[in-house]
Amino acid sequence: MFLYFSGMIDIKLLEYIESFLTPRRAGLNKKILDERTNHFTVAVEDVYQLHNTSAVIRSCDVFGVQNVHVIEEVNVKRIDREIAMGAQKWVDINRYGSTKECICALKEKGYQIVATTPHDDSIVLKDVDVSKPAAFFFGREQKGLSDLVLENADSKLHIPMVGFTESLNISVSAAIILQHVTSKLRETSVAWQLSDEEKLEKRLEWAKKVIKSHEQIIARYYENDEDK
């Protein structure tokens, strides 16, 4: 008989698979998942330079953002694994063939659309309301975000600058914004962490990614269970 969490996760299977991890690795997975959030997410729209998208994914991993949304309406490319430094294994990458599809999907999930842009009507970073779930959109290197994103944005955001340079690389902008909003979020009473079920699902998924022979281990687990 299997023991499930909310009808989804076989707890005994999870514990069995994790027994093949080192205690340090199993503990690290749990520790990192305690810092993960879906309260904020990031969307990159048709970024031309592949390393920029990869660097944004890496920043999401560093600052605990679990989901990234990649729009490839014009520029269809694979994720640069070298630049992401393995982050693509631990961050969920959601791909879209159009900007409209991405915006609709995020709005349906209750996210505020925040467009990063130097427009005059944009707010500064310190004024972001971190209590609301938000999807931060980053655009193409030269053109920035499309009119569709700007028209559908609930708010617009810019990073204050005082030098001759008027813009930052999108991966740098993403890192600055994510560091600020996630740090500010953790100081609040907002329930920003993953649910218990989401953590269990990720523990199982991450364990499989670490253990090369996980398919054989799972098959053996069910064979042993049937013999009982």
Segments the model singles out, each with a brief description of its role:
Residues 1-228:
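Post-transcriptional modification and biogenesis factors for structured RNAs
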